[in-house]
């Protein structure tokens, strides 16, 4: 079996050189016997410019990336047949081609390349070779023009853009859930939420009522004589101005009352304004909704009237209304 020194001598004899540094051109065409041994010595040929490896078969790709001075590479009918398929072997032609392009794209001085009759000789592979090797002048003895290089670069760009779009998270299909499944996953509606919705609806309905309608509801209620209702002296005594001021801070518009009539009976004009400004009714109801829950509409209305009193004139106005109502009920 030949030792390493004998392989060195054979390679130097083929190259007609006295040392590896002086080897500029190396022709290993159809060198099947010792080819794999010679390939192992290629990294030592740091000044090699022309390499011919045509008509050979090997079990691994030569270390082309180490030949940084290489200008010409001939691989006609060159084949690679891995001895075994494992995690590190080139199990497919696609893997083999990618590995080959990865190795030669680092050769920044390469000008001429021949790959006819190899697994690398495909349109896609040649496009990538032209794209990466910007110094390449001929490929398979065909000159590479600027127009051809530009066309190749455009094709590569489109391929990469398409690849990015396909890999984008936004391109994934969005799985939709049937409506009935969504309904089943919803949490049961809380009773307090339903109550809040009903309360809000009531507030909206009250805010839409006219001032006269609200006043008529208070005056025409059949429960005015409820035991809870106090006489006019009790209303005045139990309602402290200081306490009322803490609840509601607003002033009612002046009421039109004719004090010169007999018995000081008020004459309420048909277009008199409501004692409660319509814009503050929703706020009053919202503040007292929890306290008034479960009470009758009459009690709510009376409580709202009492809560709206801020001056003595307001009390006098309410007294007049109660007095008129009392006369009607008699």
UniProtKB/Swiss-Prot annotation:
Lineage, top ranks: Eukaryota, Amoebozoa, Evosea, Eumycetozoa, Dictyostelia
Species per Swiss-Prot/TrEMBL record: Dictyostelium discoideum (Social amoeba)
PROSITE patterns: LRR (PS51450)
Polar residues bias locations: 214-240
UniProt superkingdom: Eukaryota
Entry protein name: Putative protein DDB_G0285185
InterPro entries, sorted: Leu-rich_rpt (IPR001611), LRR_dom_sf (IPR032675)
Span list, region Disordered: 212-240
